[in-house]
């Protein structure tokens, strides 16, 4: 796939639209955060106009605003603690269906929603598929304990930085009122072990490593011409 912006957008659109076609009438679905998911929302809007009945649980204020704009009815995990499926993007995905997520700073709600779903549909363009996870792992932290968390995160072999906002001074604030620490790892030999190690640090709310949902994950990889659907052996089609 050509690396142009138009080609990437076409790949994301193809993946998002294919995910939306997997939604069945009467489903309660999780709606992730990010540009690829917004294409799924766009497609769902058209299907709703054609008579599809569906309600969504958004993972961020941004997604909630987009869903309302496109006429998708919304609900909450309080009212629907079990979801039929969830659709979300990823920054990286490896052959074992382990993910790094979190550029949209919604990792805690995304992980809650994905964990509540019978099936987790991950939509990516082919550049997001990697042989091994590495690079930046976002971590959501309590502001009160961020400095102490930084020291312990360094002990796990990374270079952590508090994410700075782009259009305002100061750090990025999540929808939960917390900070995002971006942790740069040169390599991640054992993603599941690292996810557990990060989670054990006091003050950490959640990390962008998703390693415990591989059994119910389907990855839709988009490119300009077609989509590839990768299904975990543990998923029942």
UniProtKB/Swiss-Prot annotation:
Task: Identify the Pfam families for this entry.
Answer: Rib_5-P_isom_A
Query: GO CC terms for this protein?
Result: cytosol
Q: How would you classify this enzyme at the top EC level?
A: isomerase
- List, in alphabetical order, the GO biological process terms annotated in this UniProt record: D-ribose metabolic process; pentose-phosphate shunt, non-oxidative branch
* Magnesium in keyword set: no
Domain of life, source organism? Archaea
Q: Which UniProt keywords apply?
A: Isomerase
Positions annotated to bind substrate: 33-36, 88-91, 101-104, 128
Q: Which residues form the active site?
A: 110
Family, similarity comment: Belongs to the ribose 5-phosphate isomerase family.
Q: What is this protein called?
A: Ribose-5-phosphate isomerase A
To which species is this protein native?
Methanoregula boonei (strain DSM 21154 / JCM 14090 / 6A8)
């Amino acid at each position: 796939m050509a690396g142009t912006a138009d080609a990437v957008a076409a790949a994301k659109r193809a993946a998002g639209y294919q995910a939306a076609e997997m939604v069945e009438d009467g489903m309660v679905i999780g709606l992730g955060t990010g540009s690829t998911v917004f294409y799924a929302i766009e497609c769902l809007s058209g299907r709703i106009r054609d008579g599809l009945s569906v309600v969504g649980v958004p993972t961020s204020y941004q997604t909630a605003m987009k869903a309302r704009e496109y006429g998708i009815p919304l609900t909450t995990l309080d009212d629907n603690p079990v979801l039929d499926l969830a659709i979300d993007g990823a920054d990286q995905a490896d052959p074992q269906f382990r993910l790094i997520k979190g550029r949209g700073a919604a990792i805690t709600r995304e992980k809650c929603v994905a964990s509540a779903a019978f099936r987790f549909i991950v939509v990516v363009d082919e550049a997001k598929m990697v042989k091994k996870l590495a690079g930046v792992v976002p971590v959501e932290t309590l502001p009160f304990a961020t400095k102490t968390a930084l020291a312990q995160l360094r002990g796990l072999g990374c270079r952590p930085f508090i994410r700075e906002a782009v259009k305002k001074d100061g750090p990025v604030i999540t929808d939960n009122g917390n900070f995002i620490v971006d942790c740069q790892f040169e390599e991640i030999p054992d993603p599941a072990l690292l996810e557990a190690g990060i989670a054990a640090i006091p003050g950490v709310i959640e990390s962008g490593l998703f390693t415990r949902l591989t059994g119910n994950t389907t990855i839709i990889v988009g490119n300009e011409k077609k989509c590839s659907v990768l299904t975990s052996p543990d998923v029942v089609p």
